[in-house]
Structures are given as structure tokens and as C-alpha cells.
Amino acid sequence: MSVSDGAATGSVRYSRVLLKVSGEAFVGEKRFGFDPAVVLRLSRDLKNVKESGVELCIVVGGGNIFRGASTSDGFERTSNDYVGMLATVINALALQNALEEMGVECRVLSAMPMTAVCETYVRRRAVRHLEKGRVVICAAGIGSPFFTTDTAAALRGIEMRCDAIFKGTQVDGVYSSDPKKDGSAVRYDRISYHDLLSSNLKIMDAAAISLARENSVPIIVFDLGRDGAFFEAVHGRGLFTTISD
């Protein structure tokens, strides 16, 4: 692992990337649902990345609406997860609307058939949308309970042959511990899949990390809450952590 010595610089370019956006990213200063200002800022960042020539696929979470695995009262796990999948579709449609208002053509593809509101996810169809210059927003995880949207992000990134998976978080990379709770936390510019898993650093779940590792797809962790951070990370600038072998 490489300890950070400042902002990363470089001319790294990706032709096709996947961005994982957690449901919490939509909340902003609110406790629940959507903060319109946050959705607008995120959409502007996505548009800038798209207009720089990068094909963009997005997997959204649903934690701003329903926290499936952590909400057990009155629900069994399978029902929890299906409700959570529906929450991701709500987020995907909201993001699609914001992007289209900015003139960005995009499609929502759901792993659960919902033909009245969006297309059903088919890999070839999703790839074709990317090739036509559309942003693809994947919803409903992988369509099965017991799998997180992090795992869905890894799977979709691999299926669609993305050059990298970008994980938007609330901090500017991977730290040795939570920097919001531990002032001595060390930030890494680079860390291996093995070190990440063995250190039990909770960036993504183990299944997602293992999928990326087995298919040699790097994961880039950055601060999605900072304006322009996604554009910078895609182009090899700014603060981020690269997870790879």
C-alpha cells in the first residue's frame, strides 16, 4: 500500500467507466429522500464527465429511502432486499430526469422487469446504449436478494467491460480507519485488493472486491460530495485511492 503524499496527478484516461453512487449521496443536508441541490450538482458532474468523451454507466443505491439489511423490524431479509431494490429504481428515475433536463441522453435499466417505467437490464442492450453515447443507469441491484448494490456495481462493471469502477464516498480515498472519528487515520494513494480485505477496511463488501480482483478491474475511491471530484478522478487528477493488484 502507498501512503498519500498529496494530490494525485497524471493523464490517466478511461474510455468507459462505472460509477457507484450510494443512496446517501442524494440526501445532502436532509435526513431522508432527495436534496435537489445535491442531485443537480451530481448531474452536472456526470454531464462534464460524459462530455469529456467517457462512456458512463452508473449503479445507484437506495439507502436514502430504505436501508434493507439494517431494517429488520417487521421484515424478513428477503422482503427487505426487494424493498431496497425498488428504492434504487426511484433514485435511478430521479437521476435520469435531472440528467435529461440538462440535455444528457440516458436510459434506466432495471434488473427487475418494470416495463412501464424503464427498460429491463440486458447486457447487450446496455452496451449498445453506451456505444450510442447514452448514459446507462442500472437499478434494482442484480435482481436477487442477499446481494448488495456494491456487488451489483462490480458485476455490471465487469459485464460491460468498464476500464475502472469508481466508488463515490464521503471521504477522499481509503484510510486506515474512519478519518471522521480518528484524527490519526492514514490515507492511501494506492492499496491492493488483498491488503484492503485483510485489513477489513469497509469500502465495499468483500464479494464486490473479490469480483473486481478476479477480473483485474481497478476500483477508484474518491469524495463524491466535492464538486468536480469525479471529473478529476476520471482524468487522473485530485485526491483518490486506487485499489488494484
Swiss-Prot record:
ATP binds at residues 20-23, 63, 67, 169-170, 175, 178. Its EC number is 2.7.4.22. One of its GO terms (biological process) is 'de novo' CTP biosynthetic process. UMP binds at residues 62, 81, 142-149. One of its GO terms (molecular function) is UMP kinase activity. Pathway: Pyrimidine metabolism; CTP biosynthesis via de novo pathway; UDP from UMP (UMPK route): step 1/1. The keyword Cell membrane does not apply. Keywords: ATP-binding, Cytoplasm, Kinase, Nucleotide-binding, Pyrimidine biosynthesis, Transferase. It is found in: Cytoplasm. It catalyses: UMP + ATP = UDP + ADP. Transmembrane segments: none annotated. Inhibited by UTP. One of its GO terms (cellular component) is cytoplasm. It comes from the Bacteria. Belongs to the UMP kinase family. PANTHER family: URIDYLATE KINASE (PTHR42833), URIDYLATE KINASE PUMPKIN, CHLOROPLASTIC (PTHR42833:SF4). Homohexamer. NCBIfam families: pyrH_bact. Catalyzes the reversible phosphorylation of UMP to UDP. This is Uridylate kinase. The gene is pyrH.
